[in-house]
From Swiss-Prot:
Residue numbers spanned by region Disordered: 21-56
Gene: sepF
Keyword Cell division carried by entry: yes
Principal cellular location given in the protein's record: cytoplasm
Membership in a protein family: Belongs to the SepF family.
GO cellular component, one term: cytoplasm
Domain of life: Bacteria
Coiled-coil regions listed in the entry: none
Pfam families: SepF
Compartment(s): Cytoplasm
Keyword vocabulary terms for this entry: Cell cycle, Cell division, Cytoplasm, Septation
Name of the protein this chain belongs to: Cell division protein SepF
Keyword RNA-binding recorded: no
Record function comment: Cell division protein that is part of the divisome complex and is recruited early to the Z-ring. Probably stimulates Z-ring formation, perhaps through the cross-linking of FtsZ protofilaments. Its function overlaps with FtsA.
Species per Swiss-Prot/TrEMBL record: Bacillus velezensis (strain DSM 23117 / BGSC 10A6 / LMG 26770 / FZB42)
Length: 152
């Protein structure tokens, strides 16, 4: 047998092989077909037991706003923890030295950036820090003295 015929026989089936091929039908083995019907992929199966449904009202009740008036830089981490727990924080920096207040604002700016939140100045030395689940709409305009504006 030539090499050409060997390759031809290897890659294609001869007509003789078709004669011996037998196709099974559902009538030949009905019990196997029923077992296959019972086995469904995991995504096609219906959930069994208790379904976890959360009321939308309970989600809204858990939203909180925390008021914070830090006296030292070390309290900035506590404010960051509130933000990580998805709570909005109003930070009053009026009772802290300017250099410490600036460090706190820098720290909180990094925190809200990391969690996808936002920080906004809402007053003189007062900031609103929000996580990504809180939307703030509107703006507060104020007349700022040149001295106050240069401070930040």
């Amino acid at each position: 047998m030539s090499m050409k015929n060997k390759l031809k026989n290897f890659f294609s089936m001869d007509e003789e092989e078709y004669e011996y091929e037998y196709i099974e039908t559902e009538q030949d083995h009905p019990e196997e077909h029923e077992q296959q019907k019972d086995k469904q992929p995991a995504y096609a199966q219906k959930p069994q037991g208790k379904q976890n449904v959360v009321s939308l009202q309970s989600v809204q009740k858990s939203s909180k706003v925390v008021l914070s008036e830090p006296r030292v830089y070390a309290e900035a981490q506590e404010i960051a923890d509130h933000l990580k727990n998805r709570r909005a924080v109003v930070v009053n920096l009026q009772r802290i030295q300017h250099d410490q207040a600036k460090r706190i604002v820098d720290f909180l700016s990094g925190t809200v950036y990391a969690i996808g939140g936002d920080i906004q100045r809402i007053g003189s030395d007062i900031f609103l820090c929000t996580p990504d689940n809180v939307d703030v709409s509107g703006t507060i305009s104020e007349l700022i003295n040149e001295d106050e504006h240069q401070r930040w």
